[in-house]
Swiss-Prot record:
Top EC class, one word: transferase
Protein name per Swiss-Prot or TrEMBL: Histidinol-phosphate aminotransferase
Pathway in which this enzyme or protein is active: Amino-acid biosynthesis; L-histidine biosynthesis; L-histidine from 5-phospho-alpha-D-ribose 1-diphosphate: step 7/9
Record Pfam families: Aminotran_1_2 (PF00155)
PROSITE patterns: AA_TRANSFER_CLASS_2
Biological process annotations from GO: L-histidine biosynthetic process
Cofactor: pyridoxal 5'-phosphate
Extent of the signal sequence: none
Assigned protein family: Belongs to the class-II pyridoxal-phosphate-dependent aminotransferase family. Histidinol-phosphate aminotransferase subfamily.
Source species of the chain: Escherichia fergusonii (strain ATCC 35469 / DSM 13698 / CCUG 18766 / IAM 14443 / JCM 21226 / LMG 7866 / NBRC 102419 / NCTC 12128 / CDC 0568-73)
Quaternary assembly: Homodimer.
Length: 356
C-alpha cells in the first residue's frame, strides 16, 4: 500500500505553484533597501484606540469615510482590505469560476495578478504590451472571450509610465457587459491627475485599486482600497474576511487619511519627485547605464550593461535593487526605488565605480 504524503493531499495547482518572490522574501543583508518601492523613512503615529479586547468593525467607518472624501467618491464605493493585494484576490474570487473563467493582464507588470489567479485555480491570459509599454488593444480584444477580470497597472510597475487614457476608454468599451476592468493605481499619488476615480459613474464595470503602502509611507500597515460601484463592492463584501483590518491598522489608517495626514503625504510626494529627477539626471551620466526610462512614480527603471553583474556588485555592497531581467522585454533592466539623498548618492557612487 502506497503512503500518501502531505504534499499528495494538496490541491494540484498549489503543488505546482512557485511562491511570489516579494522584495522582502528575496532578502539580502543590505542597508540601502531600494527594491520594494517603500518610502525611505518611518512616519510616526500614536495609537488612540484602546479597545483591543473587542473585534474590529469589518469596514471601519472613519477609514472608509476619510478615504472616500480623499478619493472623491461615495463611501458606498469604497472597500478597505489587507493591502491592495487582497483586493486583487477578492475580485478574482467574486467574479471568476475556477476551471472556467480567466483573468487577463499585460506584461511586463506587477506579479500578484497571476499569483492570485493561480492560487485560486483560474486561468491567466497575457497580452504583452507594445514597444512603448502601452496596451495592445487588438491583442486584448482577440483574447477576451471567457475573460472575467482584466488588470491594468497605471502607472505601471515596474516600467513607471501611465497608460494612455484613451486606451483605457477603448478597453472599457470592449469589456462592457463582459468583464471587470481593474485599474491598479498603487502609485497614483505621484501623478494624481491621471486617476480614473472620476470615471466610476460612466463605467459600472470599472474597479480601482489603491494602497497606503507607497506615498502614504505605510507599507508595514497592509492597508489597501478598492474603489468601485456599489454592485461590485456588495459582491466583494460577500467574499472578504469578517475582520480584514485590525484595530491598530484602522486607527493609524484613519489618522493617515485626516487632512493633516493627506497634507503630509503630499509633501512627501513633492520631495520624492524632486529626488527622482535628481537620480534620473545622475544615472544618465553613468557609463554602465544604457537607458533610463521616464517615470511617474517613486521608482526608476533603467537598462544596464552587464546588469546581473551590476546587481550583484551593488548587492555585495549592501545596496539592494530589484532585478527585472526575467520580465518580458526587460532584459538588462533593474528597478531602483527613490530613497533619501544619501541613498541616491550611495547608488550613484557605486554605479560610477562599475567597470564594464
Amino acid at each position: 500500500m502506497s503512503t500518501v504524503t502531505i504534499t499528495d493531499l494538496a490541491r494540484e495547482n498549489v503543488r505546482n505553484l512557485t511562491p511570489y518572490q516579494s522584495a522582502r522574501r528575496l532578502g539580502g543583508n543590505g542597508d540601502v533597501w531600494l527594491n520594494a518601492n517603500e518610502y525611505p523613512t518611518a512616519v510616526e503615529f500614536q495609537l488612540t484606540q484602546q479597545t483591543l479586547n473587542r473585534y474590529p468593525e469589518c469596514q471601519p467607518k472613519a477609514v472608509i469615510d476619510n478615504y472616500a472624501q480623499y478619493a472623491g467618491v461615495k463611501p458606498e464605493q469604497v472597500l478597505v482590505s489587507r493591502g491592495a493585494d487582497e483586493g486583487i484576490e477578492l475580485l478574482i474570487r467574486a467574479f471568476c469560476e475556477p476551471g472556467k473563467d480567466a483573468i487577463l493582464y499585460c506584461p511586463p507588470t506587477y506579479g500578484m495578478y497571476s499569483v492570485s489567479a493561480e492560487t485560486i485555480g483560474v486561468e491567466c491570459r497575457t497580452v504583452p504590451t507594445l514597444e512603448n509599454w502601452q496596451l495592445d488593444l487588438q491583442g486584448i480584444s482577440d483574447k477576451l472571450d471567457g475573460v472575467k477580470v482584466v488588470y491594468v497597472c497605471s502607472p505601471n510597475n515596474p516600467t513607471g509610465q501611465l497608460i494612455n487614457p484613451q486606451d483605457f476608454r477603448t478597453l472599457l468599451e470592449l469589456t462592457r457587459g463582459k468583464a471587470i476592468v481593474v485599474a491598479d493605481e498603487a502609485y497614483i499619488e505621484f501623478c494624481p491627475q491621471a486617476s480614473l476615480a472620476g470615471w466610476l459613474a460612466e463605467y459600472p464595470h470599472l474597479a480601482i485599486l489603491r494602497t497606503l503602502s507607497k506615498a502614504f509611507a505605510l507599507a508595514g500597515l497592509r492597508c489597501g482600497f478598492t474603489l468601485a460601484n456599489e454592485d461590485v463592492i456588495n459582491l466583494l463584501m460577500k467574499v472578504i474576511a469578517p475582520y480584514p483590518l485590525s484595530t491598530p491598522v484602522a486607527d493609524i489608517a484613519a489618522q493617515a487619511l485626516s487632512p493633516q495626514g493627506i497634507l503630509a503625504m503630499r509633501e512627501r510626494v513633492v520631495q520624492i519627485i524632486a529626488e527622482r529627477e535628481y537620480l534620473i539626471g545622475a544615472l544618465k551620466e553613468i557609463p554602465c547605464v544604457e537607458q533610463v526610462f521616464d517615470s511617474e512614480t517613486n521608482y526608476i527603471l533603467a537598462r544596464f550593461k552587464a546588469s546581473s553583474a551590476v546587481f550583484k556588485s551593488l548587492w555585495d555592497q549592501g545596496i539592494i535593487l530589484r532585478d527585472q531581467n526575467k520580465q518580458p522585454s526587460l532584459s538588462g533592466c533593474l528597478r531602483i526605488t527613490v530613497g533619501t539623498r544619501e541613498e541616491s548618492q550611495r547608488v550613484i557612487d557605486a554605479l560610477r565605480a562599475e567597470q564594464v
